[in-house]
Amino acid sequence: MDKFIKGMDVSSLPEEAALGARFYDEGKEGDALEILKKYGANSLRIRLWNDPYSEDGKPYSAGTNDFTKLVALASAGKKLGYNYLLDLHYSDFWADPGKQFPPKEWAYADADTLEKNVYDYTKDVLLKLKRLDLLPEMVQVGNEITNGLMWPHGKWDNVDNIARFISAGIRAVREVSPDSRVMLHLDCGGNNARCREWFDAYVQRGEDFDVIG
């Protein structure tokens, strides 16, 4: 992945297609990934939510990005020559600076257990992808983690836990897929002071990473 990355998040594409979305190039209907490839796209971002369904099995929508959809998108992309970034939210739905809720299954876990869960889950996902020959070129450990992840244990006022949780994910990536680059992803790229504060705090405590997103 040394070439310039030109990509997009296509996580909602299968759900959009199922709801009737159609894609066109100069008036001719075509496959969205093929159209994007034609115009120079070379990388896909695909998010993964732990369990994006309610207790009675209803999908949360907005992509309902479970493992099955990840495999379908990654497979379609690989066939067309795309690289892809795996975006691990460690949540059942959108994780962002305003909400970083752990998965339902982890809701009552303490910090030690959460650290183990992150490692085990990340490792399990990557091992499954490895068996399918679908390992990603890059793994994003957490999504928009400016204010931490898996609240309340991983809120910004507990940087030690944030570093523990992220590092657990990184260790799993390095173990299973050492050729995958590791990205840490904030939402405040235009705020130099906040980014410096965050990364200064993290690098004193956490595992090494490769890319800032």
Question: What feature does the model see in each segment?
Answer:
Residues N65-V71, A95-F209:
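Active-site cleft segment of glycoside hydrolase catalytic domains centered on the general acid/base Glu
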Residues M1-K78, N83, S91-E115, G213:
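N-terminal substrate-binding region of glycoside hydrolase catalytic domains
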Residues V10-L13, R47-W49, D87-H89, V141-I145, ...:
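Active-site-proximal beta-strand/loop segments in catalytic clefts of secreted hydrolases
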